[in-house]
């Protein structure tokens, strides 16, 4: 293991320009910042959790970060390299609504079986509540829903065939037909 290259290889850069929503210049800047924070060129779960803790200092971000990490780590090797990082960032920050829905579904589908169960959804919603902290959550959560009540409300709107699981199709259809569902998923009730 030598020192990680401080520059992206031209073929990697070209590939990322083609497969993300970032320009060549933006990718170079992101890579520079990524190497500054991760000199090894990869992030493990603990390092990833530390980044989340910086962004959410008033709550416990560790559980949510664990789920985000799983979603970022496309090859399942227990680390996030720059490619995985920038591709996920591209989708979450600049992707189409459809791409964002696919990414969110992946995060909620904990076991990757193509369906979201009530327990899976509850785990993510509880992690969001913990991450943002009690005081902020009380401000955001003007409807006063507990995590379980929020899950029940989401399932009522999304689970079209009432089989207690949400497929990708149900997820997308409901989110497109009722944008307030997306707010429920984010636990952001500010209008």
Curated annotation (Swiss-Prot):
PROSITE patterns: EF_HAND_1, EF_HAND_2
Record has Metal-binding as a keyword: yes
List of residues binding Ca(2+) 3: 159, 161, 163, 165, 170
Binding site for Ca(2+) 1: 73, 75, 77, 79, 84
Keyword Lipoprotein applies: yes
Pfam families found in the cross-reference section: EF-hand_1, EF-hand_7
Start and end residues of each EF-hand domain: 24-59, 60-95, 96-131, 146-181
GO molecular function: calcium channel regulator activity; calcium ion binding; protein domain specific binding
InterPro entries referenced in this protein's UniProt entry, alphabetically: EF-hand-dom_pair, EF_Hand_1_Ca_BS, EF_hand_dom, Recoverin
A GO BP annotation: regulation of signal transduction
Keyword set, alphabetical order: Calcium, Lipoprotein, Metal-binding, Myristate, Repeat
UniProt cross-references to CDD domains, sorted A to Z: EFh
Binding site for Ca(2+) 2: 109, 111, 113, 115, 120
Disulfide bonds: none
Lipidated sites in chain (N-myristoyl glycine): 2
Family named by the database record: Belongs to the recoverin family.
Purpose of the protein: May be involved in the calcium-dependent regulation of rhodopsin phosphorylation.
Further comment: Probably binds two or three calcium ions.
Record-given protein name: Hippocalcin-like protein 4
Species whose genome carries this gene: Homo sapiens (Human)
Lineage: Eukaryota, Metazoa, Chordata, Craniata, Vertebrata
Gene: HPCAL4
């Amino acid at each position: 293991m030598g020192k990680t290259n401080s520059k992206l290889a031209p073929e990697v850069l070209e590939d990322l320009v083609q497969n993300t929503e970032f320009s060549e210049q933006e990718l170079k800047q992101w890579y520079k910042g990524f190497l500054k924070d991760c000199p090894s060129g990869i992030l493990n779960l603990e390092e990833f959790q530390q980044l989340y803790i910086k962004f959410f200092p008033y709550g416990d971000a560790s559980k949510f970060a664990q789920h985000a990490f799983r979603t970022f780590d496309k090859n399942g090797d227990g680390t996030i390299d720059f490619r995985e990082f920038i591709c996920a960032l591209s989708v979450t920050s600049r992707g189409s609504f459809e791409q964002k829905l696919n990414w969110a579904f992946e995060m909620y589908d904990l076991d990757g079986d193509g369906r979201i169960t009530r327990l899976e959804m509850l785990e993510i919603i509880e992690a969001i509540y913990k991450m943002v902290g009690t005081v902020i959550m009380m401000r955001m959560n003007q409807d006063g829903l507990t995590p379980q009540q929020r899950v029940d409300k989401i399932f009522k709107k999304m689970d079209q065939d009432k089989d207690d699981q949400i497929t990708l199709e149900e997820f997308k259809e409901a989110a497109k037909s009722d944008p307030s569902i997306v707010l429920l998923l984010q636990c952001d009730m500010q209008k």
